[in-house]
Structure formats: C-alpha cells, structure tokens
C-alpha cells in the first residue's frame, strides 16, 4: 500500500516558536511510520523554510529553547509542497494559526489539517471572535477594546472610535468592569503578553506591555472559578467533543510559564465538574466551533464561575498544543482516542475535504 505523503510544518515567526517546535516534533514521533511518509519542515524565526536531512525515525522531541539541527534550506517552497498529499501545519500564533499560511495552501490547492482561512483568522483575533460569539448568544466575560499605536483609541460597543489618554482608559475600564481584570493583546496565543491586574497602576502597566505584542488590546473582567477546556474534532462527517479537562495552575493564572515551564502546574482529566456541566460545555464547544465555521480541530476554553456556577466562553484555539503535556491530545486520549489514532483522524478528515 502506497504511503500518504505528510508534510509536518513547525517553528514559525511567532512568539510561540519554541512551543511549536515541541508540538511539531511530538507529532512527528507519534505519526504511524507504516502509513505515512513524513516530511518534517522547520521554519526559523526569520521565516526561512528548511527540510530535515536525517531520517525521520531519528528525530527527537525538542525541548523548549532548543532548535532543530541537520537542516537544508528549501529553495522553492511551492515546488516542495506540490509533492505532498496533505500538510500538518503545527504552527501556533501569528503567521501560522491566523489564516496566512492556510491561504497559501489554498492557493497551491493543497489539502491541510485544521481550520480554513476565515476561521483561523477570526479565532486568532480575540476581539472579532468575541463579536461572533455574541451573535451566537454564547455567554462571555465583559470586556472593552482599545487600539494602541502612537495614540490610544477607545472602541465602543457600536464600533465608534474615540481618542483617549491612558488614564482615561483606566477610568473607562473601572466604570464598566470589576477587578481583577485581564489585559490581552488581541492577536496572541499561549498567554503571551497577557497580564492579570488588581488596581489602576497595574492596569496602566499591563496596557503598555500588551501594546508591545499587538496594536489592538482587550481588557476583560476576570472570572473567579474553574478554568475548563474541551477538545473538538471533526471526523466521520460530524463534530465531536471530548471529555473536559481542568487547569490547576501553579500561578495566579495560566500564563505562558505555567503552561510550559512550571512543573507544579497540573491538569485534571476529566474536570472536577458534574456530568450535567460537562455536557453543557461539550455542547457549547461544538456551538462555538460551528459559529466560526471551524473545521478539523480546535480546543475551546471556558470558565465556570464559583459564585454562580455559570459557564463563560474564554477563547477558541484553532491549532492547540501537541506537546506531551498539552491538553488537546490528553483529552482525546482520555476519551478513547490515543495520540496516533487522533492524528489519523485529522489526516483522514483533511484528505476528504
């Protein structure tokens, strides 16, 4: 039987480059070598594309802050990808998860795993994804939006814009939201550039920090409660939701360091919630996925408020982590679909669509 040619792309130009390296090499190790002819492709931080020169079987899972070796630069990316049956873009953040590379695959007419251009770009932008979830009547945290370039612009609910000073943003936020608040770059993942704040001075500093990562900033009211995640998979003609998992962060919130470098951060699978609450979250996860016209794969994150037991949608990730500690493969493993079989399902779905 002829093997399916699979290109696994990882690395990339985003701030999540190192996580993508770990995810990508984890995927390569877990792909069935008898079914697939695997072509690892590494993109460095400058955006140059490389192929591996050693045997796929020798590729080890990279650790954070480790870069791959034994590489050869690809002269013509288009020609190289033309020979592939399917592409697995294990890229997190900008230039990989935001619709840009998906657009390239569409132009080349190549089949690929994951959400298409529109869903990828919308879900990468926290502000615009919130607008869609509002339209779908999915419960979310309260928030305000500002634009930050050489000046600050406040954007109201009707998308009217008003030039505003930093201290006036703080006043607006305090008028509309309660502490604690979270300040987030609109286009960022793995909690990069995200800050939890408890007072006006912290809020000012957090806005300045977020501005380094994006020119559009989201300020959200914090939810005191459980952080619960659900994996979604499009397979066999239907959208399925996994069991839920719970984040037990060693830090105040599930930051980049607590996700990838703090050994005390843990996940609880299944989440410590009732059967009814799990079913509610599973239905909401599928609804959110369909609302953005998702395809293939996503992980949807929620909060359950301690005081009210109410569920709030946090965000949707169209290319979740695939490291050994990542929630997405762990959730499906607990739901009866091991890592290797999960990859089979994702590839099968991509080849059909």
Identify the meaning behind each predicted range.
Residues 93, 191, 247-250, 317-331:
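Glycine-rich phosphate/pyrophosphate-binding beta-alpha loops
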Residues 38, 111-112, 140, 181, ...:
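Hydrophobic beta-strand scaffold residues
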Residues 2-10, 14, 22, 77-81, ...:
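Active-site nucleotide/adenylate-binding loops and adjacent lid/helix of ATP-dependent enzymes
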Residues 221, 231-232, 289-322, 332:
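Conserved metal-phosphate-binding beta-hairpin within the catalytic cores
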Residues 246-298, 330-353:
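Active-site "cap" helix and flanking loop/linker of ATP-utilizing ligase/carboxylase catalytic domains
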Residues 195-283, 307-312:
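Phosphate-binding site of ATP-dependent enzymes
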Residues 1-118, 122-128, 147-164, 168:
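ATP-binding N-terminal substructure of ATP-dependent carboxylate-amine bond-forming enzymes
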